[in-house]
Amino acid sequence: MTTRGLEDLDGGLGSCLPSDDLPFLEEPASGRRRESKARGTSRRADSSDWTHVLQDPVAAGAGDAGLKKMEKELAGKESTAGKAGTSPRIVPARRKPQAPPPLQPPPPPLQPPPRTPSDDLPWGDLTLNKCLVLASLVALLGSALQLCRDAVAGEVVAAPHPWVPPSSPPKKEASPAPKPPVLVSPSGSPQPKPGPPQARMQDEPELPGSPEATETRVERGGSISEASGEESVPLGDRGSQEKPRKEKPSKGEKLKKEKPRREKPRREDKSQVTGEPRQSLPRRWEAREGGRRPWGRDSRDLLEHGKLQAWAPRRRHDRDDRPRQKRGKGRD
């Protein structure tokens, strides 16, 4: 009852609070008017509350609850009215056209990191393939230059000369052998026919006991002594004379003397060495003249002149005539 009476009184008294049915009657008010209205309503409510409390103390508890409820309703109405009154009057502010942001300059390029001394080396970027290509190019250039040089110079490879062995020194011709002296028989036998002396000497077999052999030996001994130029001197005179010093021949003379000896070895018949008689072979003159030697001696001549023995040595007269020295005890 109390709440209805208050509502009726409020409505009859002509409250200035806007109702929900007439929102357009709401006047625009500033914040101060709203605050005054809220204060006036609160005062009226307080005064009415005090009157109700005084009139009916029994119903005080119920009135407190109703007051609270009314306060809530009034607060809700005020909030809705404030929203409705302010919403149409709010004019959006004109936004000024914003100038476009200034264009930013492009970022500077990134600088490469500082190089270390190892990166500055010339072979820093070289690889194995690059080295191989470079070496092949250098080899090709070298071969091309060599070919050009050979073509310009016109060098021609000479054909290899055949190898010639060194010529041996010419051999010296051996001196001709001296001719042996021609034998002349004491008797008037016919002389032998002219022919090569060596063939004659080989054809004539000399007997060991014949005087021809002795004469040939004597002549050979005499020729050797004459060639050497040494004179026979008695033994007594030899002792008084000083022995001449032998001069050593030079090497060239020795070689000259030894060469003819080597080239002319002396031939000795086997028959003379062994002492056997040499068998005579058939000769041409034997076939022509019936086997008789034209220069051979008869058996008579051999008996007359063959008394000398072949083995007996020839006695030298100078040794027999010289006085023999008596051997003393070494005293003068």
Swiss-Prot record:
<feature type="region of interest" description="Disordered">
    <location>
        <begin position="159"/>
        <end position="332"/>
    </location>
</feature>
<feature type="compositionally biased region" description="Pro residues">
    <location>
        <begin position="98"/>
        <end position="116"/>
    </location>
</feature>
<dbReference type="GO" id="GO:0016529">
    <property type="term" value="C:sarcoplasmic reticulum"/>
</dbReference>
<feature type="compositionally biased region" description="Basic and acidic residues">
    <location>
        <begin position="66"/>
        <end position="76"/>
    </location>
</feature>
<dbReference type="GO" id="GO:0072657">
    <property type="term" value="P:protein localization to membrane"/>
</dbReference>
<keyword id="KW-0597">Phosphoprotein</keyword>
<protein>
    <recommendedName>
        <fullName>Junctional sarcoplasmic reticulum protein 1</fullName>
    </recommendedName>
</protein>
<feature type="compositionally biased region" description="Pro residues">
    <location>
        <begin position="177"/>
        <end position="197"/>
    </location>
</feature>
<keyword id="KW-0703">Sarcoplasmic reticulum</keyword>
<feature type="compositionally biased region" description="Basic and acidic residues">
    <location>
        <begin position="239"/>
        <end position="256"/>
    </location>
</feature>
<keyword id="KW-0256">Endoplasmic reticulum</keyword>
<feature type="compositionally biased region" description="Low complexity">
    <location>
        <begin position="221"/>
        <end position="232"/>
    </location>
</feature>
<comment type="function">
    <text>Involved in skeletal muscle excitation/contraction coupling (EC), probably acting as a regulator of the voltage-sensitive calcium channel CACNA1S. EC is a physiological process whereby an electrical signal (depolarization of the plasma membrane) is converted into a chemical signal, a calcium gradient, by the opening of ryanodine receptor calcium release channels. May regulate CACNA1S membrane targeting and activity.</text>
</comment>
<keyword id="KW-0472">Membrane</keyword>
<dbReference type="GO" id="GO:0033017">
    <property type="term" value="C:sarcoplasmic reticulum membrane"/>
</dbReference>
<comment type="subunit">
    <text>Interacts with CACNA1S, CACNB1 and calsequestrin.</text>
</comment>
<feature type="compositionally biased region" description="Basic and acidic residues">
    <location>
        <begin position="283"/>
        <end position="307"/>
    </location>
</feature>
<feature type="region of interest" description="Disordered">
    <location>
        <begin position="1"/>
        <end position="125"/>
    </location>
</feature>
<dbReference type="GO" id="GO:0003009">
    <property type="term" value="P:skeletal muscle contraction"/>
</dbReference>
<feature type="modified residue" description="Phosphoserine">
    <location>
        <position position="228"/>
    </location>
</feature>
<dbReference type="Pfam" id="PF15312">
    <property type="entry name" value="JSRP"/>
</dbReference>
<feature type="region of interest" description="Mediates interaction with CACNA1S">
    <location>
        <begin position="1"/>
        <end position="80"/>
    </location>
</feature>
<feature type="modified residue" description="Phosphothreonine">
    <location>
        <position position="51"/>
    </location>
</feature>
<dbReference type="InterPro" id="IPR026178">
    <property type="entry name" value="JSRP1"/>
</dbReference>
<feature type="modified residue" description="Phosphoserine">
    <location>
        <position position="223"/>
    </location>
</feature>
